[in-house]
Amino acid sequence: MSQFKSRFGIDIDGTVTTPDTLIPHINKQYNTNIVLDDVIEYDFLSAFPHPVDRKEFAKWFKENEGYMYSVSHIAKDAKKILDQWQHQYELIYISARDTSVFPITQKWFEENQVPFHHIDLIGSHDKLEAAKKHQVEVFFEDKHDNAVLLAEELKIPVILFDTPYNRKAVPNTVVRVNNWLEANKWIKQHF
């Protein structure tokens, strides 16, 4: 019997970290002034005022992702809420990050004192199998299509952190929140 009441699946980027945390790095590299409100699709390139070669961007991102992840900013109140949850719920982070950045990711969690029980970097945005494997009972996400898929396929609630890039319609099992305090309020009412 587990010591935890429930298992939470939690995305990292844009959920535990601020959704705009990568933007200053992109602006510096591409000499742009993108802000989060410009990113209305889950695709930074959609916000550029000029065309950018996708292959070049992907190459630059891959070369710099470790550093960018290592200096990512934690979302307001995320640490406080996760600290409260760590003894009651099993915190399982499931991220699209590549496994090659696992040491950097774990170090970021430790340096920022963000509690975790397991970190699963799956290298793609398809989190369905990992969520099934870990038998999560609720998922915290910022990517619209992931939230909808997880909610519909697993029949679990998904907490969707509101951003300009995820404002499409969602089913009733996807609960849109503005911040970690609202997420915590929902969890207290339902878990």
Question: How should each PLM-predicted stretch be described?
Answer:
Residues 66-93, 98-106:
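Short, acidic loop-to-helix structural element flanking the phosphoryl-transfer center
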Residues 87, 96-191:
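C-terminal cap/substrate-recognition subdomain and adjoining C-terminal extension
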Residues 1, 7-9, 84, 112, ...:
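Generic structural signal for beta-strand residues in well-ordered domains
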Residues 21, 40, 52-60, 81, ...:
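Exposed alpha-helical structural elements
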Residues 1-57:
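Active-site neighborhood of HAD-like aspartate-dependent phosphohydrolases
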Residues 45-77:
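Metal-dependent phosphoesterase signature
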Residues 27-38, 54-57, 77-82, 101-104, ...:
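Short N-terminal helix-initiation segments at or just after the protein's N-terminus
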Residues 6-8, 91, 139:
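Generic beta-sheet signal
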